[in-house]
């Protein structure tokens, strides 16, 4: 049963949105300006494609230069109900002819050492509000970079042709 919204709910929502405009937005803009001026965030990303295959519930990753050399494996859980899928199920079995013939993309993102140092300094100086604002901004920027990288990888692998153009819609 859908609850109808009363006038009080509408006023609460409007007050909340006004608080965002009056209070939160200026703080965000202040921090974004400071981050740009002082170079507090230094976004970096590294990603690559590695040969891989499935061994039971594990995805086994191999060296791209020496395809028989195992770099590591990810033992993954299987769903406890429903179809009982495991992420490894979506990779080609290593017992198939030709060895590792699937690919797994790997990525890492960072906002840099300066961001880490700045957050620690704010916390140590008991500037908790500033610490939380800066830390939150850094985390959101790292997440956005990870999402952007993921979209790029999907595009490079040809999976993105039918996906929305706007990142927020992916």
Predicted feature residues:
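Charged, low-complexity helical/coil segments in non-catalytic cytosolic or luminal regions
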Residues: 142-155
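Short alpha-helical basic/polar micro-motif
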Residues: 139
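Active-site loops and adjacent core secondary-structure elements that bind or stabilize anionic groups
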Residues: 5, 9-132, 136, 157-159, ...
């Amino acid at each position: 049963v859908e609850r109808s919204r009363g006038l009080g709910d509408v006023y609460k929502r409007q007050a909340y949105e006004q608080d965002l405009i009056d209070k939160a937005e200026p703080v965000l803009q202040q921090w974004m300006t400071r981050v740009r001026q002082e170079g507090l965030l230094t976004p970096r990303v590294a990603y690559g494609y590695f040969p891989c295959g499935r061994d039971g519930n594990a995805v086994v990753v191999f060296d791209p230069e020496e395809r028989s050399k195992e770099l590591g494996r990810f033992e993954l859980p299987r769903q406890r109900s429903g179809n009982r899928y495991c992420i490894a199920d979506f990779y080609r079995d290593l017992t198939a002819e030709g060895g590792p013939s699937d690919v797994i993309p790997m990525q890492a993102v960072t906002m840099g050492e300066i961001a880490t140092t700045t957050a620690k300094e704010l916390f140590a100086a008991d500037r908790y509000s500033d610490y939380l604002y800066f830390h939150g901004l850094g985390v959101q920027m790292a997440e956005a970079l990870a999402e952007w990288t993921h979209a790029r990888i999907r595009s490079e692998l040809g999976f993105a042709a039918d996906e929305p153009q706007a990142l927020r819609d992916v």
